[in-house]
Amino acid sequence: MKDYQISQELSLLGEFSKKVRHYLHTIPEVSGAEYKTSAYCRKMMQSFGYLVVEYPGFTGFHADLNIAGNIKRVAFRADMDGLEMPDLTESEYRSVHENMAHNCGHDSHMAIALTAARFLAENQHTLNCNVRFIFQMAEEDMRVPGAEKMVEGGCISGVDEIYALHNDASMEVGSVKINDGIMSSWGAAWTLDIGGISAHGSTPQKGLDAIREAVRIIDDLDYIVAKKTSPFSPAVFGCGMIHGGTVPNAVPDYVQARGTIRSMDEETDSVLKNHLASIITESTLRGFRTTMVSTGYPAVINHKEAFQRVIQSASCFLQRIDSHCKPMTGSEDFSYMVNAVPDRKGALFFLGSGCAEKGINNYLHSNPYYLDDDCLLVGAQIFINLVTR
């Protein structure tokens, strides 16, 4: 039984929100190439009467509902990209795109935004602020920082406050998690390229073994996290991919490895980056052609006033609110948008999208990934309350 109550007016959009999510779930697209998704959302926002602003060369866009000139503007972010993995869900609306799935639930983020946007447009006579919905490309791939590109393109221009949510199917529908500080880690994706010298496997002294050097560097990176950072400041290092060598009886002359590194404070982030640079320098002095490219996101840090506004907007109809949750070790490029708003007035919160009774209790990026459609109106109600209460 539900322990929350959606407004009667918003409840009328329940079927609309489900239909939107189910369609978007069928067409997940890779980061930066969300063409069908973007076109669908743009057409929908235009039909509601929003002024749509596109970004040449990018799939992201924002849409404005303008009430008056000299009043504040509140913005909401919805990310659009899917993940490169098969959709293993058993539903009539499973992905029709091979090896693509919405296993991070961005389909729900867009459905929530579109539902809230429709409601606000139909009830704009009750608003006392301007509204912007930002449909962001490329949140998943740290090599293509979609939020940063959109900020550079002007998506935050004129914005006074900004909010975003992320679904979490390990939490029950009707619950929210947030805090008034760090919500996500400083995170970076790294790509390590090592060039050595090939030689016959019987004469290893004549070559420079790129695989052995990769193992040494990866081990050193693990050591940095374990021994060069404070035990009171968590950090996580991971290597998820290694490719190298061509035949079994030769010294390999090239290796590429890729992974991520994350931390929970800016000082630790700086320590990690400085040690990474010294490791690469040491490798080149050993004769290897070694480079490391690192791209990542700063942490999302919730503004205290924006945090309070989320609490107020959720607590008026929800009972299960954790206002002191621990930050996630994952990273979010929503930080670029928050940092671009005056006084950094913005907040990210987690929205329960699971349901134990329905057997929905899974983690982001797991496969299959299910979420409960009942979360859609809960998220939309919070967004609506943020601009109407």
Model-derived regions: residue spans:
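General structural feature for long, well-ordered alpha-helical segments within catalytic domains
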Residues: 2, 13-16, 20, 33-44, ...
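Non-cysteine beta-strand/loop elements that form the S-adenosyl-L-methionine
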Residues: 75-77, 86, 190, 347-353
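Metal-dependent amide/peptide-bond hydrolase catalytic core
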Residues: 215-389
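Histidine/acidic-residue-rich, glycine-tolerant segments that coordinate divalent metal ions
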Residues: 62, 83, 91-101, 108, ...
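Histidine-centered active-site/metal-ligand motif
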Residues: 25-27, 102, 106-109, 166, ...
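Divalent metal-coordination and catalytic microenvironments
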Residues: 24, 76, 106, 133, ...
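Acidic/His- and Gly-rich active-site-bordering loop/insert found
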Residues: 2-102, 107, 111-129
